[in-house]
From Swiss-Prot:
Lineage of origin: Bacteria, Pseudomonadati, Pseudomonadota, Gammaproteobacteria, Pasteurellales
Species of the source: Haemophilus influenzae (strain ATCC 51907 / DSM 11121 / KW20 / Rd)
Positions bearing N6-(pyridoxal phosphate)lysine: K36
Catalytic reaction annotation: L-alanine = D-alanine
Record-given protein name: Alanine racemase
Signal peptide: none
Keywords for this protein: Isomerase, Pyridoxal phosphate
Pathway: Amino-acid biosynthesis; D-alanine biosynthesis; D-alanine from L-alanine: step 1/1
KW GTP-binding (keyword) present: no
EC annotation from Swiss-Prot or TrEMBL: 5.1.1.1
Assigned GO CC terms: cytosol
A Pfam short name: Ala_racemase_N
Entry-linked HAMAP family: Ala_racemase
Length: 360
């Protein structure tokens, strides 16, 4: 018997392949590769090391993420997409060549007070319609002029904004955001970025000087389609194994609460994967996994360490057989549709108990 527990297999080849497709979409744009949240659950050091020679900058959400990259030998510029949180962190940014977004008056005032060993690169975040972070359109000129005065920052500002509906192709709101962004930056020097994954795929006029690929870099669609439709390949294959195959009689319940009873005699497979590994607990009955060339449905309640699947009465599956929870054979977008949970959330919720294997 050879049983392998929950394992995320991360492919450097797929990662590089996806980056090439992204470059084909926006050949004249620099790439800010978004690796926040442990590179969307894929391993931030591995992803950054794999891509460093082929991107211009990395985007993260927290200073700790940026410092982890620096301590592991990553030398390309790193951008704090939410900006700095504490004034005392500004010298750390300067020493480590970490760039920052500025999106409010508090950050501007902190920069004015800062005593830095060297100037830092600043990107002015502009609220073009997301209404989450960013300075208002009528404040852009003020912030621009104030920032340009400061010896604490490098002379060429960047400009950044974010779409709220890039995946809604029938909406004119994204075009409105593009127009607003172009309008408030047209007479100002500096690189601009507004296109994240949805903008890269669907709004070519938004590509500008820099793009910020996130979820598509990992082979996952930002819409309700699948990445394969855009030529993307899943970077992660999440697998586990059957740890038991049981004969199951018609009418017998399975698992906690007995919420599923079999309508016929069948075989039940027990998979070493549960919510303790980050797989959702409340998945609907029938959510598929991939096993021996076919999809089989989850039945019963997902528990902390295991889930159960209906193999069928005539199945030949054996203990130790590999089960794919999502990946090339079963797109995570399909699992997302069944569960009602975004692919973004599924991919970032895996726990440290899941073994990570990095492959070519």
């Amino acid at each position: 018997m050879n049983v392998k527990p929950a394992t995320a297999k991360i492919s450097s080849h797929a990662l590089k392949q996806n980056l090439e497709i992204i470059k084909q979409k926006a050949p004249n744009s620099k790439i800010i590769a978004v690796v926040k949240a442990n590179a969307y659950g894929h391993g931030v050091v591995f992803v950054a090391s794999t891509l460093e020679q082929n991107v211009d900058c990395f985007g993260v959400a927290r200073l700790e993420e940026a410092l982890a990259l620096r301590s592991n030998g990553i030398t390309k510029p790193i951008l704090l997409l939410e900006g700095f949180f504490n004034e005392q962190d500004l010298p750390i940014l300067a020493v480590n060549n970490i760039e920052t977004v500025v999106h409010n008056h508090e950050q501007l005032d902190a920069l004015k007070r800062a005593n830095l060993p060297s100037p830092i690169k600043v990107w002015l975040k502009i609220d073009t319609g997301m209404h989450r972070l960013g300075v208002a359109l009528d404040e852009v000129d003020y912030f621009y002029q104030e920032l340009k005065k400061l010896p604490q920052i490098q002379p060429h500002l960047g400009f950044v904004s974010h779409f709220s509906r890039a995946d809604e192709l029938e909406s004119d709101y994204t075009q409105l955001q593009i127009n607003r962004f172009l309008s408030v930056t047209k007479d100002k020097q500096g690189e601009r970025t507004i296109a994240a994954s949805g903008g890269i795929l669907f709004w070519p006029k938004s590509h500008l000087e820099c793009i910020r690929p996130g979820i598509i870099m990992y082979g996952i669609s930002p819409t309700d389609t699948i990445g394969k439709e855009f030529g993307l390949t899943p970077v992660m294959n999440l697998t586990s194994s059957l740890i038991a195959v049981r004969h199951h009689k018609q009418g017998d319940p399975v698992g906690y609460g007995g919420i599923w009873t079999s309508p016929r005699d069948t075989k039940i497979g027990v998979v070493a994967m549960g919510y303790g590994d980050g797989y959702p607990r409340d998945v609907p009955e029938g959510t598929p996994v991939y096993l021996n060339g076919r999809l089989v449905p989850i039945v019963g309640r997902v528990s902390m360490d295991m889930l159960t699947v209906d193999l069928g009465a005539d199945s030949q599956d054996l203990v130790g057989d590999e089960v794919i929870l999502w990946g090339k054979e079963l797109p995570i977008e399909t699992v997302a549709k069944f569960t009602g949970i975004l692919s973004y959330e599924l991919i970032t919720k895996l726990t440290p108990r899941v073994i990570t294997e990095y492959v070519d």
